[in-house]
């Protein structure tokens, strides 16, 4: 089946099966179709697409909601108070499909179809108050929180509500809320008549790699059950996006995944540029690719060292941090910052490459291959490391897709899925590189894949070094923000545009757009909704880490606590990426 036939065939099959319950196809600028369904077939349509259709859609990439109460530009869309959106991916078709449901605050659950919908529905309940007809606990906000933060009626800043006063009664209530009863979660306290030990692993344990708690039921050292508890790092990033200008939100993207640097900026800007109709110049595209691959290496070096450390090897992390500093020195010279560069712009990048950038990059490229060889001898060829990781924490491709796993965690199972190859963006189609794959889907393969990815990133950076085109680093487009400085100095129209964009903000045309990239942890996706104003009406941030943690309870039963620590390290997450 060709790509141009993949989606029309799926749409026709859906319409044939459900008829008038497929209410409308929304006209958008997206690269995939958007269908509105009737509530009566919401669950059945998802089951049909996942289990019954030829070349199915096994991956629920995202599930999110939009409060439509203040939205003005909704031509051709069914009336809705809160719209529920699901984003499905077919690997066989290499195609996406988005389904929408108009709700009055109630929606059918699809957790019985897509297992990973559980956390997404909990989030939609937490943020919007959606009722899915089943018991749904808050997931990001504390249980004592009043209201649903992503509703338009909910305040965005603390200054919009009375001063906070911590009374004795409130303190006691908050303290009680921190106690989690396994009975209320449906988790057993006994095994073969013996009482299990309930252990709080985190939220301040160094091996949780952030403020993350896992409630464990233990029989001796063996994990019987696990219940992840997230939200401690939640900062309301999606709410912040509604209060910032389109340009002003870029620095916040860096803090979604604070180890990813510009990688977190790119999907947001791809979405905004799609809405604006901006074509980014070739030089800016290649600069973006080069910097993204640098940050991919920076992240993987950190993972590599801490992965080894969590199974008892202390030396590698110190060597790898030293090499990370060499990379960060280059990034600092180019972007002006090490970890939070805010360097990409709507229509390009902030500035051109500095004088001498090529010598710095060439030095790094000459240095790193031998270092990676040394790390392979220290870690991957270590008998102790292999004994702790081979065959531990293994899962197959079907299980990975069931729980929304993407990136190295998916490719470690042997699944060749990398958006840089399959759906090239920002000029990735110009580069020659391989996609490293594993076989067993265990901790060792997840480590091996990331180690090999660093070598491929070096290949991409070397090609950027040898083929960097000349030309501008910002698009010549009225919505490029900020406009090219040279143009501002020559004509009054560009200067006026700069003044308006800097004071009021860029006016982005009404519509919806999605930016997808192959991030260092997996599929990173920004879905933005513009109502024709200077701020986003809705910004949905789909991060890979949120999906990856949900699979922990299915993987770790039967492990020892020590193996649990190794498995957590092999996921490679940061809690800001989970909690946003």
UniProtKB/Swiss-Prot annotation:
Places the protein is found: Cell inner membrane
Keyword hit for Zinc? no
Enzyme class of the recorded protein, top EC level: translocase
Q: Where is this region: NADH dehydrogenase I subunit C?
A: 1-171
Against InterPro entries, the record matches this protein to:
NADH_DH_suCD, NADH_Q_OxRdtase_suD, NADH_quin_OxRdtase_su_C/D-like, NADH_UbQ_OxRdtase_30kDa_su, NADH_UbQ_OxRdtase_49kDa_CS, NDH1_su_D/H, NiFe-Hase_large
| Membrane topology category | Peripheral membrane protein
GO CC terms in record: NADH dehydrogenase complex; plasma membrane
Catalytic activity annotation: a quinone + NADH + 5 H(+)(in) = a quinol + NAD(+) + 4 H(+)(out)
Region listing for NADH dehydrogenase I subunit D, in residue ranges = 195-580
Q: Which domain of life is it from?
A: Bacteria
For the keyword Transport, the answer is yes
**Recorded GO MF terms:** NAD binding; NADH dehydrogenase (ubiquinone) activity; NADH:ubiquinone reductase (non-electrogenic) activity; quinone binding
User: Which keywords belong to this entry?
Assistant: Cell inner membrane, Cell membrane, Membrane, Multifunctional enzyme, NAD, Quinone, Translocase, Transport, Ubiquinone
Any Pfam family the entry gives: Complex1_49kDa
According to its UniProt record, the EC number is: 7.1.1.-
Member of which family? In the N-terminal section; belongs to the complex I 30 kDa subunit family.
Q: How does it assemble?
A: NDH-1 is composed of 13 different subunits. Subunits NuoB, CD, E, F, and G constitute the peripheral sector of the complex.
Q: What does this protein do?
A: NDH-1 shuttles electrons from NADH, via FMN and iron-sulfur (Fe-S) centers, to quinones in the respiratory chain. The immediate electron acceptor for the enzyme in this species is believed to be ubiquinone. Couples the redox reaction to proton translocation (for every two electrons transferred, four hydrogen ions are translocated across the cytoplasmic membrane), and thus conserves the redox energy in a proton gradient.
NCBIfam families according to UniProt: NuoD, PRK06075.1, PRK11742.1
Q: Which HAMAP family match?
A: NDH1_NuoCD_1, NDH1_NuoD
Q: What is this protein called?
A: NADH-quinone oxidoreductase subunit C/D
- Quote the gene name from the UniProt entry: nuoC
């Amino acid at each position: 089946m060709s790509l141009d036939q993949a989606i029309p065939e799926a749409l026709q099959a859906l319409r044939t099966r459900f008829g008038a319950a497929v209410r409308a196809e929304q006209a958008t600028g997206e690269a995939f179709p958007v269908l509105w369904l009737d509530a009566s077939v919401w669950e059945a349509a998802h089951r049909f697409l996942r289990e019954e259709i030829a070349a199915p859609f096994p991956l629920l990439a995202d599930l999110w909601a939009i409060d439509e109460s203040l939205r003005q530009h909704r031509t051709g869309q069914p009336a809705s108070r809160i719209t529920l959106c699901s984003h499905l991916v077919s690997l066989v078709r290499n195609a996406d499909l988005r389904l929408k449901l108009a709700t009055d605050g109630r929606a059918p659950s699809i957790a019985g179809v897509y297992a990973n919908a559980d956390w997404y529905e909990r989030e939609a309940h937490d943020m919007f108050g959606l009722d899915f007809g089943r018991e749904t606990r808050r997931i990001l906000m504390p249980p004592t929180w009043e209201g649903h933060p992503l509703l338009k009626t909910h305040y965005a800043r603390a200054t919009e509500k009375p001063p906070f006063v911590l009374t004795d009664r409130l303190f006691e209530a908050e303290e009680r809320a921190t106690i989690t009863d396994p009975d209320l979660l449906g988790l057993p306290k006994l095994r073969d008549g013996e009482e299990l030990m309930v252990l709080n692993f985190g939220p301040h344990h160094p091996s949780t790699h952030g403020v993350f708690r896992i409630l464990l039921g233990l029989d001796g050292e063996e994990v019987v059950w696990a219940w992840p508890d997230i939200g401690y790092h939640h900062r309301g990033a999606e709410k912040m996006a509604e209060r910032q200008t389109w340009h002003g939100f870029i620095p916040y993207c860096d803090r979604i995944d604070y180890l990813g640097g510009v990688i977190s900026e790119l999907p947001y800007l791809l979405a905004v540029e799609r809405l604006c109709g901006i074509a980014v110049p070739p030089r800016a595209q290649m600069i973006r690719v080069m910097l993204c691959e640098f940050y991919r290496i920076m992240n993987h070096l950190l993972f590599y060292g801490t992965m080894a450390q969590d199974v008892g090897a202390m030396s590698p992390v110190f060597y790898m941090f030293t090499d990370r500093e060499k990379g960060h020195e280059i990034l600092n010279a180019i972007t002006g910052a090490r970890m939070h560069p805010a360097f990409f712009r709507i229509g390009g990048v902030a500035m051109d490459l500095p004088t001498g950038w090529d010598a710095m990059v060439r030095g790094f490229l000459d240095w790193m291959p031998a270092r990676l060889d040394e790390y392979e001898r220290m870690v991957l060829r270590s008998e102790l490391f292999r004994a702790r990781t081979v065959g531990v924490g293994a899962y197959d491709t079907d299980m990975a897709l069931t729980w929304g796993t993407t990136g190295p965690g998916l490719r470690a199972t042997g699944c060749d899925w990398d958006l840089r190859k399959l759906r090239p963006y920002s000029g990735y189609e110009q580069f020659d590189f391989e996609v490293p794959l594993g076989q067993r889907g265990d901790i060792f393969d997840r480590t091996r894949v990331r180690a090999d990815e660093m070598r491929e990133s070096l290949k991409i950076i070397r090609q950027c070094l040898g083929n960097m085109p000349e030309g501008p680093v910002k698009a010549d487009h009225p919505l490029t923000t900020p406009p090219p400085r040279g143009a501002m100095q020559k004509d009054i129209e560009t200067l006026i545009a700069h003044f308006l964009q800097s004071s009021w903000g860029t006016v982005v045309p009404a519509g919806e757009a999605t930016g997808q990239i192959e991030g260092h942890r997996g599929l990173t996706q920004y879905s933005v909704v513009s109502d024709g104003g200077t701020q986003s009406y809705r910004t949905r941030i789909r991060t890979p880490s949120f999906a990856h943690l949900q699979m922990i309870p299915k993987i770790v039963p039967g492990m020892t606590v020590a193996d649990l620590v190794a498995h957590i390290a092999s996921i490679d997450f940061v809690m800001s990426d989970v909690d946003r």
